[in-house]
């Protein structure tokens, strides 16, 4: 941090007592079970396919590859931390003596709601992930019943399945992937069938005892460098923020129908607790107002609109993100620093020249990590906004004050 930023940062600290601090929920889940794609994959695809995911992935928080498609922690990592739960071990990773006592992660990068096909990045579709969970639960209960206390340290007790939290963040690959072979109208027409499959999966989880369900909607897909590079070469197809309009239109319709389905499911199963979380609005707000949000205003649940109202908008602009769409790790330079032929950390010969997709100097200035996934700094911001409860339906009940802590 340079001298100017340091001075302005301490001005914020001096006046911190004047800020309005949001309240946070007192989470009391003994366990968590997660389903999804790369947004929350903590190593399942890497273990399942036997592939490598090297540095600079994981360079910030783990100092080594964490098997996450990110420079550090994901949204789910921050949420687990707030719930006083450990980071979730991936279901398919058997090395390192994984502990599943407080939950398990079934999410795998590239996964879809619809069944996988021969061209899918991941074979672990939503339905298959649920089947893995059912086997996990059955096998864990069997081991605990047969071996007594031998596995108590590593496997969930039976009541953790009914009391635990079931988190789901999947669907972006169904929508974004469809644009490679379908028109916008065809993509929009396919959404009901996608959600029918999703609803069937929810019912399977309910039948297995899942009662506390979080459903994250999909983010602004048109703002990912991968989609801009492929579908945004015609500037007339971009919105005011430089995002592909068609992709965001599809994401909005998907989310609208997903929200309606979530409400219907809640009505059908009144003993369930279904929470719909509007990730699209959080990420869209971040991209549209990137200079107002940054690495020093993520963990604290500060009402950032209040900061601006009391005259600190200039300080926010200095401390905020600097690159809303450009990838930190990639090749090609501005405006996107993305080339679909090479992924973050790889070295390849492109157009007769050997190039390496390297990370930027300071990933905390970027929202996008590799053209597809978000940086740790952006993920921390997203998780902090989730925890305000303002983006959930129903909103989190305010049960306890959130004690302000600042990370340097």
From Swiss-Prot:
Give the keywords, sorted. Glycoprotein, Hydrolase, Lipid degradation, Lipid metabolism, Secreted, Signal
Principal localization reads secreted
Gene3D superfamilies from the entry?
SGNH hydrolase
Q: Where would you find this protein in the cell?
A: Secreted
**GO terms under cellular component:** extracellular region
Write the signal peptide boundaries: 1-24
Carbohydrate-modified residues are 273, 289, 361
Highest taxon in the source lineage: Eukaryota
List the active-site residues: 38, 370, 373
- Please name the top-level EC class of this enzyme: hydrolase
Cross-referenced InterPro entries, in alphabetical order? GDSL (IPR001087), SGNH_hydro_sf (IPR036514), SGNH_plant_lipase-like (IPR035669)
One Gene Ontology molecular-function label: hydrolase activity, acting on ester bonds
A Pfam family that the UniProt record links to this protein: Lipase_GDSL
Q: Does the keyword Lipid metabolism apply?
A: yes
Instruction: Give a GO biological-process term.
Output: lipid catabolic process
Q: What is its EC number?
A: 3.1.1.-
The family annotation for this protein states: Belongs to the 'GDSL' lipolytic enzyme family.
Q: What is this protein called?
A: GDSL esterase/lipase At1g54790
Native organism: Arabidopsis thaliana (Mouse-ear cress)
């Amino acid at each position: 941090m340079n001298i100017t930023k340091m001075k302005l940062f301490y001005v914020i600290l001096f006046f911190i007592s004047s800020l309005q601090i949001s309240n946070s929920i007192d989470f009391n889940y003994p366990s968590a079970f997660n389903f999804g794609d790369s947004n929350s994959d903590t190593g399942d695809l890497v273990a399942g396919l036997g592939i490598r995911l090297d540095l600079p992935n994981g360079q910030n928080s783990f100092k080594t590859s964490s098997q996450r498609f990110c420079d550090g922690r994901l949204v789910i990592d921050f949420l687990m931390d707030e719930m006083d739960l450990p980071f979730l071990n991936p279901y398919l990773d058997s090395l390192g003596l994984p502990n599943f006592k407080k939950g398990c992660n079934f999410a795998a990068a590239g996964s879809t709601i619809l069944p996988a096909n021969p061209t899918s990045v991941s074979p672990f579709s939503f339905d298959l992930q649920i089947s893995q969970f059912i086997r996990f639960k059955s096998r864990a209960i069997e081991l605990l019943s047969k071996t007594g206390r031998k596995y108590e340290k590593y496997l969930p007790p039976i009541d953790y399945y009914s009391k635990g939290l079931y988190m789901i963040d999947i669907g972006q690959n169904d929508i974004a992937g469809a644009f490679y072979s379908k028109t916008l109208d065809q993509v929009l027409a396919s959404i009901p069938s996608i959600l029918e499959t999703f609803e069937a999966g929810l019912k399977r989880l309910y039948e297995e005892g899942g009662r506390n369900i979080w459903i994250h909607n999909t983010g602004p897909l048109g703002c990912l460098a991968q989609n801009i590079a492929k579908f945004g070469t015609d500037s007339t197809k971009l919105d005011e923020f430089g995002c592909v309009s068609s992709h965001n239109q599809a994401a909005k319709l998907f989310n609208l129908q997903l929200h309606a389905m979530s409400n219907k499911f809640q009505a059908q199963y009144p003993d369930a607790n279904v929470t719909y979380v509007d990730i699209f609005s959080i990420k869209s707000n971040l991209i549209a107002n990137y200079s107002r949000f940054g690495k020093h205003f993520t963990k604290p649940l500060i009402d950032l609109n209040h900061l601006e109202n009391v005259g600190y908008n200039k300080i926010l602009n200095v401390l905020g993100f600097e690159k809303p769409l450009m990838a930190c790790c990639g090749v090609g330079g501005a405006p996107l620093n993305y080339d679909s032929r090479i992924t973050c950390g790889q070295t390849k010969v492109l157009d007769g020249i050997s190039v390496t997709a390297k990370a930027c100097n300071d990933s905390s200035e970027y929202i996008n990590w590799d053209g597809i996934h978000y940086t740790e700094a952006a993920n921390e911001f997203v998780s902090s906004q989730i925890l305000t409860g303002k983006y959930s339906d129903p909103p989190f009940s305010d049960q306890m004050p959130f004690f302000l802590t600042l990370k340097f």
